[in-house]
């Protein structure tokens, strides 16, 4: 039997009585965001909307993004990364569990030196993939050019945000590279490993 999303009490400023809201809505009010699934358009849009709202509400308060993400779609992931760079508040990224594929790309998007991994977190990087395309050769060629542009952008971001040489990033993105939290810190994906 599924538990569902727990409800917690929340009292808005000026209210005398608390109301019951789902856990995530309560945490969002505290500027705590969660990416705990594959990245798709829906979750990316929700998180980007929350970031814009929280930035407009108070651009001086940091936002904390907790990540337990096995990957997901490239386009929404790049959009989420770009939004993290565009808003005024610093975004802390905290890897809890796994940040793989697009999840690791979101992890590096946090404000330096505010990228954190919990002690037993696992991080995996690799290149963006394109799904099998069932269309004309011209359409496939256009899609492959677009995938190449995205791959180049993601590679540049990893180079800039990890300080690894370009050859290292290009080599490592050509395969699945798994890292522990301490290995990810040495690589430059995170700045801090939280103490257990």
Swiss-Prot record:
Function: Cleaves peptides in various proteins in a process that requires ATP hydrolysis. Has a chymotrypsin-like activity. Plays a major role in the degradation of misfolded proteins.
Disulfide bond residue pairs: none
Cellular compartments annotated: Plastid, Chloroplast stroma
HAMAP family documented for this protein: ClpP (MF_00444)
Protein name: ATP-dependent Clp protease proteolytic subunit
EC annotation from Swiss-Prot or TrEMBL: 3.4.21.92
GO cellular component: chloroplast stroma; endopeptidase Clp complex
InterPro entries: ClpP (IPR001907), ClpP/crotonase-like_dom_sf (IPR029045), ClpP/TepA (IPR023562), ClpP_His_AS (IPR033135), ClpP_Ser_AS (IPR018215)
Subunit structure: Component of the chloroplastic Clp protease core complex.
Family from the record: Belongs to the peptidase S14 family.
Location of the active site: 101, 126
Keyword terms: Chloroplast, Hydrolase, Plastid, Protease, Serine protease
Molecular-function GO term, any one: ATP-dependent peptidase activity
Enzymatic reactions: Hydrolysis of proteins to small peptides in the presence of ATP and magnesium. alpha-casein is the usual test substrate. In the absence of ATP, only oligopeptides shorter than five residues are hydrolyzed (such as succinyl-Leu-Tyr-|-NHMec, and Leu-Tyr-Leu-|-Tyr-Trp, in which cleavage of the -Tyr-|-Leu- and -Tyr-|-Trp bonds also occurs)
GO process terms (BP): protein quality control for misfolded or incompletely synthesized proteins
Name of the gene this protein is made from: clpP
